[in-house]
Amino acid sequence: MNTNDISAFFVYGTLKKSYLRGGLWPRKPLRIVAGAIQSDLYDLGPYPAAAPGKHWLLGEIWEFNYADMDPTIAELDLIEGYNPLRENNEYTRQIVTVEILGPESRPQKLRAFAYFAAQPKRLEVARKIKPFLEFLGRPVAAWPDASSRVPSSFSEE
């Protein structure tokens, strides 16, 4: 699969701009917009994890210049504990189709990288976050919800 045409990340947890890791991005994005993917969302305590599922998950799309993608991928892989050469990762990087609000308030689709839980067994004991918001006319889940514990420092993770 060709990934050279992808210049965006979909994030849904501590990498969002107003959260703990939102300031760790190595490059400045061209824009940040709301978007949703089809996925289930789980609360792992101080951060969430997504897994393939039937619900919709609300997050942010961070779009970059193509020239900024390699260093951004390298840094985010490190932050998310993903190494494509290792078997026991916490997360795995995948390509997703994201729906955003496009021109004239019409839904628009784009492809982006996103990190998903690499160890589904961990999710068996995690709290599933149910949809509680609406985006593009459909119910969506989002992190944090009213029961989530949001870390304010790295020592709280």
Residue spans for each PLM region:
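Glycine-aromatic micro-motifs
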Residues: 2-157
